[in-house]
């Protein structure tokens, strides 16, 4: 069974049968309405962000599978802060995140991460926050990373 894989970037919850989906999937005889509906359902939580989407199509049976990636960590942080962009100077602070928010972002990124450990992904999110000029719980993210290492956040991390 020949398969075709199509990779596109879609704004969360706003896929349409037009470009980039239409040209990429046109001619395969698929129900575009069904594909668009499923993509929009799976990406609705990423409204306002571009999300990587992969559609795997069995060209004989016309069955398809949709896989949705996660936006970059920096985009998730900006969405939480309702900010347009990070600071060009990490010493200039653009906002503050609660540790619960950092953990939620880490949970979103866990599936696509190189490590199965939530604690490590939390530290990666903290590193991104640092480079963007974002504090966590009113502190420098490096300080919060040390707290994570010492076990101070284990209760929140399920550890």
From Swiss-Prot:
Family: Belongs to the universal ribosomal protein uL11 family.
Protein keywords: Ribonucleoprotein, Ribosomal protein, RNA-binding, rRNA-binding
Organism for this UniProt entry: Korarchaeum cryptofilum (strain OPF8)
Entries under InterPro entries matching the protein: Ribosomal_uL11, Ribosomal_uL11_C, Ribosomal_uL11_C_sf, Ribosomal_uL11_CS, Ribosomal_uL11_N, Ribosomal_uL11_N_sf
Biased composition (Basic and acidic residues): 137-149
Gene: rpl11
Ranges where the record places region Disordered: 137-159
Stated name of the protein: Large ribosomal subunit protein uL11
Xref: NCBIfam families: PRK01143.1 (NF002232)
GO annotation terms (biological process): translation
Quaternary structure and interacting proteins, as annotated: Part of the ribosomal stalk of the 50S ribosomal subunit. Interacts with L10 and the large rRNA to form the base of the stalk. L10 forms an elongated spine to which L12 dimers bind in a sequential fashion forming a multimeric L10(L12)X complex.
GO-annotated molecular function: large ribosomal subunit rRNA binding; structural constituent of ribosome
SUPFAM superfamilies registered for this protein in UniProt: Ribosomal L11/L12e N-terminal domain, Ribosomal protein L11, C-terminal domain
GO cellular component, one term: large ribosomal subunit
Coiled-coil ranges per UniProt: none
Highest taxon, organism lineage: Archaea
Entry-linked SMART domains: RL11
A Pfam entry, by short name: Ribosomal_L11_N
Functional note: Forms part of the ribosomal stalk which helps the ribosome interact with GTP-bound translation factors.
């Amino acid at each position: 069974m020949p398969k075709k894989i199509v990779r596109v970037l879609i704004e969360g919850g706003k896929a349409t049968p037009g470009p980039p989906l239409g040209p990429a999937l046109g001619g395969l005889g698929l129900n575009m309405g069904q594909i668009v509906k499923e993509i929009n359902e799976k990406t609705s939580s990423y409204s306002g962000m571009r999300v990587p989407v992969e559609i795997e199509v069995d060209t004989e049976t016309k069955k398809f599978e949709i896989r949705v990636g996660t936006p970059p960590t920096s985009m998730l942080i900006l969405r939480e802060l309702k900010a347009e962009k990070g600071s060009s100077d990490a010493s200039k602070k653009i906002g503050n995140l609660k540790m619960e928010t950092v953990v939620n972002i880490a949970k979103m990124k866990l599936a696509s991460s190189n490590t199965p450990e939530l604690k490590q992904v939390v530290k990666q999110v903290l590193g991104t926050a640092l480079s963007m000029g974002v504090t966590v719980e009113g502190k420098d993210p490096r300080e919060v990373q040390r707290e994570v290492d010492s076990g101070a956040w284990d209760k929140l991390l399920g550890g």
